[in-house]
Amino acid sequence: MAKKSLIQREKKRHKLEQKYHLIRRSLKKKIRSKVSPLSLSEKTKMQEKLQSLPRNSAPTRLHRRCFLTGRPRANYRDFGLSGHILREMVYACLLPGATRSSW
């Protein structure tokens, strides 16, 4: 089980990312716009605004975690579980439609 502080930190990052998502996306869109090209000084101002946003609001700072154990590795997106928890739940028939493979 992961430390509770790490899980809370990840939740905080997720909230920040949701809060600043639209602002970050619009700034990036304006910087990369080829329809109405900006001057170099305008682009640097936009870049400074983008850099002034909180670091933890960037989507690359997020990390998927198992919602039962908080384990950050070997997560399956479809289930939101880590590999060993997924395996245990499949063996206990707690996931409908998932079966053990046999050949």
From Swiss-Prot:
<keyword id="KW-0694">RNA-binding</keyword>
<comment type="function">
    <text>Binds 16S rRNA, required for the assembly of 30S particles.</text>
</comment>
<comment type="similarity">
    <text>Belongs to the universal ribosomal protein uS14 family.</text>
</comment>
<keyword id="KW-0689">Ribosomal protein</keyword>
<dbReference type="GO" id="GO:0006412">
    <property type="term" value="P:translation"/>
</dbReference>
<feature type="region of interest" description="Disordered">
    <location>
        <begin position="34"/>
        <end position="56"/>
    </location>
</feature>
<dbReference type="GO" id="GO:0003735">
    <property type="term" value="F:structural constituent of ribosome"/>
</dbReference>
<dbReference type="InterPro" id="IPR001209">
    <property type="entry name" value="Ribosomal_uS14"/>
</dbReference>
<protein>
    <recommendedName>
        <fullName>Small ribosomal subunit protein uS14c</fullName>
    </recommendedName>
</protein>
<keyword id="KW-0699">rRNA-binding</keyword>
<dbReference type="GO" id="GO:0009507">
    <property type="term" value="C:chloroplast"/>
</dbReference>
<dbReference type="GO" id="GO:0019843">
    <property type="term" value="F:rRNA binding"/>
</dbReference>
<keyword id="KW-0150">Chloroplast</keyword>
<dbReference type="InterPro" id="IPR018271">
    <property type="entry name" value="Ribosomal_uS14_CS"/>
</dbReference>
<dbReference type="GO" id="GO:0015935">
    <property type="term" value="C:small ribosomal subunit"/>
</dbReference>
<dbReference type="Pfam" id="PF00253">
    <property type="entry name" value="Ribosomal_S14"/>
</dbReference>
<comment type="subunit">
    <text>Part of the 30S ribosomal subunit.</text>
</comment>
<keyword id="KW-0934">Plastid</keyword>
<keyword id="KW-0687">Ribonucleoprotein</keyword>
<dbReference type="InterPro" id="IPR023036">
    <property type="entry name" value="Ribosomal_uS14_bac/plastid"/>
</dbReference>
